[in-house]
């Protein structure tokens, strides 16, 4: 009986750490990949300078596209572990919204990354034609529309749904809950003000993951603070 309790306690501590590590990994990889993509494919890229710019930034795009799938895998792990560790505290409605919006966010990020990759590959085959007929401009516009309009709003929905669960379960301090709501609303309604605002999401995941890691490392104090995964046992 004692050994079972010890094993259960270890599992409760190990799983939050896994979520924290996955969240930190996602935040770092996604942050870097988005910066590389935006610098390599800026919104105002057009005209005769586009060819030279694309040629000199092919490596940056390739590196970003390599990191995006791994960032997605880390985010899937983060979602799965957090949802599993909600346990009996899980609200089926908000958990379903959280998981669905997270999957849609990843799908749209992958689609935007695939379009960026298609631009680079096609440019290597027929550079002049792509510049002349506007394919590069069109593809870049689709990529930024998917990323800045749809993916970012799904990220906002993810934040709101998870934050609502935290509010109900008191899993995190109240100030953090209110800050999360404010940032989520900002992503939902004000994304057109700055195309760099998508970086709010990985920064938020990073802060959350650091908090989870900090609490989990405190051992028995984790349950005393109402940490995610505490089922009141």
Residue ranges and their predicted role:
Residues 2-233:
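Hydrophobic, aromatic-enriched alpha-helical segments typical of multi-pass transmembrane helices
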């Amino acid at each position: 009986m004692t050994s079972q309790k010890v094993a259960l306690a270890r599992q409760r501590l190990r799983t939050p750490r896994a979520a924290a590590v996955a969240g930190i990994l996602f935040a770092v990889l996604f942050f870097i990949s988005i910066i590389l993509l935006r610098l390599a494919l800026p919104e105002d890229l057009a005209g005769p300078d586009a060819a030279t710019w694309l040629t000199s930034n092919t490596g940056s795009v390739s590196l970003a596209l390599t990191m995006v799938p791994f960032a997605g895998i880390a985010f899937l792990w983060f979602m799965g572990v957090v949802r599993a560790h909600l346990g009996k505290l899980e609200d089926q409605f908000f958990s379903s919204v959280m998981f669905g919006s997270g999957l849609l966010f990843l799908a749209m990020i992958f689609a935007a990354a695939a379009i960026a990759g298609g631009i680079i590959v096609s440019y290597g085959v027929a550079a002049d034609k792509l510049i002349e007929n506007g394919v590069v401009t069109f593809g870049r516009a689709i990529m930024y529309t998917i990323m800045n309009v749809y993916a970012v709003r799904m990220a906002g929905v993810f934040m709101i749904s998870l934050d609502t669960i935290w509010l109900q379960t008191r899993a995190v301090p109240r100030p953090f809950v209110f800050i999360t709501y404010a940032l989520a609303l900002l992503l939902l309604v004000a994304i057109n003000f700055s195309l760099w605002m998508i970086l709010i999401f990985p920064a938020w995941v990073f802060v959350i993951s650091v908090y989870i890691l900090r609490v989990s490392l405190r051992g028995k104090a984790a349950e005393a603070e109402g940490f995610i995964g505490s089922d009141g046992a």
